[in-house]
Curated annotation (Swiss-Prot):
E.C. code: 2.1.1.173, 2.1.1.264
Enzyme class: transferase
GO molecular function: 23S rRNA (guanine(2445)-N(2))-methyltransferase activity; RNA binding; rRNA (guanine-N7-)-methyltransferase activity
Organism in which the protein naturally occurs: Actinobacillus succinogenes (strain ATCC 55618 / DSM 22257 / CCUG 43843 / 130Z)
Keyword Methyltransferase among UniProt keywords: yes
Stored InterPro entries: 23SrRNA_methyltr_KL, DNA_methylase_N6_adenine_CS, RlmKL-like_Mtase, RlmKL-like_Mtase_CS, RlmL_1st, SAM-dep_methyl-trfase, SAM-dependent_MTases_sf, THUMP_dom
GO terms for cellular component: cytoplasm
Pfam families in the cross-refs: Methyltrans_SAM, RlmL_1st, THUMP, UPF0020
Gene that produces this protein: rlmL
Name of the molecule in the record: Ribosomal RNA large subunit methyltransferase K/L
Database matches in PROSITE patterns: THUMP (PS51165), UPF0020 (PS01261)
Amino acid sequence: MKPLFATCARGFEELLKTELTELGAQDVRIAQGGVHFGADDETQYKTLLWSRLASRILLPIAQSKIYSDLDLYSTVVSQAWLEHFDERTHFFVDFNGTNREIRHSQFGAMRVKDGIVDYFERHGKARPNVDKENPDVRIHAYLNRDDLILSLDLSGEALHMRGYREDSGQAPLRETLAAALVLRSGWQKGTPLVDPMCGSGTLLIEAAQMEAQIAPQLHRSHWGFDFWKGHNQAVWEKVKAEAVALAEAQMEKNPLRNGEKGTVLCNPPYGERLGTTPALIALYSVFGQRLKQQFGGWNVSVFSSEQGLLDCLRMRSFRQFKAKNGPLDCVQKNYRISDRSSVQTDERAAENPAVSADSAHTDVATDFANRLQKNIKKIEKWAQQQGLDAYRLYDADLPDYNLAVDRYGDHIVVQEYAAPKNIDENKTRQRLLDAVTATLAVTGVETSKLILKVRRKQKGSNQYEKLANKGEYFYVTEYGAKLWVNLTDYLDTGLFLDHRLTRKMLGEMAKDKDFLNLFAYTGSATVHAALGGAKSTTTVDMSNTYLNWAEQNLILNDVDGKRHKLIQADCLQWLMRCDKQFDLIFVDPPTFSNSKRMEDSWDVQRDHIKLMKNLKRILRPNGTIVFSNNKRGFKMDFDGLAQLGLNALEISAKTLPLDFERNKQIHNCWLLTRKV
């Protein structure tokens, strides 16, 4: 009876213990990341051939305390390596772990290698060669703090490499993990197992091998024990022959019977796998509905890293298991679908042939779906009359659904507002997922054209922080102007929809005037002014990215560039240096900014009078300043304006379009002129 250690993914130790016991292992004890057990030669080979869960089977040959690299070397060089393999054998060292002295696993592996080759030289043998790609023998060294365990790896290649597939696909599921998922799913041999998202079929292949009693390593041609002197070829041939005979006997059986209820087991896409979030929300929602419609009386087991996506199934699990899929923390949830689920669905379909799984989308977030449908009916007709294809459909109308829904052509953007800290995070997440599901159903938009964003309170220029790098631009129309938008790369899209009427007004005011657009963003107001017949335009922003965007907006509208200047600068500093006069000035500064690129911090409430003073200096006698900002509760300093000789007329209500009429504080807007 020799001591062995079977490694496995964390969380599968109990399953592995049961499996090894069934294979005849003795003195089976769980450890972190594996299982200790004792075995004779026959059981040793059985565990190698038959274990579906073990990653490797190791034969420990030495244990020692390691306080320095010399201790490590001395331990290795003192082992009787010639009892295990000869000098013609190519070997490789796997070293895992560190301590205070052995700080890098690569250094540890090098010292183990040095000890082995020096041992052979001391015994008058040639130095064995190291082969990283195809070694004959693998040495496994594990260092935990100061405790070293040296082992021979009897497996060779890791045991998850079954050899039945060459292409792992886009989102591979390791075979040992797949086997564990099958065992934990509740599936019973002899009953159907369905994987509706099978990918390369790993789950089904592992289950089929269990059903047919095919040893998972039956087709492996190279083992870690092939060149090991302790290898018992006769016993190995016996164990392998028994496995072949069992598999052949099972091939003649057909244990599955039509009409039986069984188990649905799948590993659907999730965030780090394939697809985008809205598509996944739709997938899980429809999947849950289909399961309840078509699989009454079945068991269901779903493996995912996203709890929120599992919630979209809208089913209550009776058991769950945690597991790792590579670096991802995942969970496997088991469900039972009652027979009445499919019966009730069939009855609904009989009463109303129009009932389908797609209509079930609106069974979630019904209040939200009804409000969105009502808004669409009202707003889309108006938008068509106005010549708009970018507008807001929903803006936190209902307190339980704190989000905005915007249409940009044939795309939909769902923006979640940050919830108050006292609201349960899980509840907020579920409401968002339900709202996305309902939005897909109500709007009919393709899942690939629904973009989901999470908004947080922005400080300074953080609202311009890049989120992605897809570079996907398309244009929308607004009162005859064409404007580029990007729905994915930034938190904002390049177009503030609430300022639509302000831009239209600027276009109507700009004819034959010199126009200044300060804090210009992507220059959409400049486009309207240019199309409105402005004599010249000057567009100033601190961001080169947005100035380039503004330039592309002008080009898109065939605006002659000679009379239209684009200037990259700190707007406040540029304003102090500017000596040109303007007839019409549009200024829409941030509420607050402390950008490192600005010389001073900015607060619109604190600093707006100073801004007006500098603007008045470059404003022609009959000129107009259009001043806007987004600070809720902003109070104009009329006394300060009076001292500057300026009049202010608030026009906020006139600049609020129909699709923003419920949010009267989204911006405030003012006309400022010189006092006569």
